[in-house]
Amino acid sequence: MEENFLYYIEHSIRIHWEEPALTDYQGQTHTFGDVAHHIARLHLLFEESGIRRGDKIALCSRNQTNWGIAFLAILSYGAVAVPILHEFKADNIRHIVNHSEARILFAGTPIWEELQKEEMPKPETVIKMEDY
């Protein structure tokens, strides 16, 4: 049996399904099962958006549980995660998103509000990190 990163994620989810996996700063806890359900929903979104193996998906927000879940969903789908520090200025974030050709952008609300959307021909889809 080949063991790799995804194997360990799947294995951990299966054996710890009901146990806490992630807790946010407000104290809301997600079990491994919750994480698996969120990942599955994001996989459906990626599929409906036409995302294929190797396509880039950018993430830019403060640390939060949804960031971690989105990151795991991207990797387990076979897409390429493009993590962007939320401390970057809006023009730098736009440049990274444009240069990477990210097809989807997960963005925290404060970051999304600062970006000039018309200067980003891609991404095709933007998801507010707090909303999924």
For each predicted feature, which ranges?
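Generic structural signal for beta-strand residues in well-ordered domains
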Residues: 13-15, 50-52, 119
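Conserved AMP-binding/adenylate-forming core of the ANL superfamily
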Residues: 18-64, 68-72, 89-94
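Short alpha-helical scaffold segments that flank and stabilize functional sites
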Residues: 15, 38, 64, 73-77, ...
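A short N-terminal helical cap/helix-turn-helix that marks the beginning
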Residues: 1-21
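Structural core segment of the AMP-binding/adenylate-forming
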Residues: 48-49, 76-132
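Hydrophobic face of alpha-helices
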Residues: 6, 36-39, 112
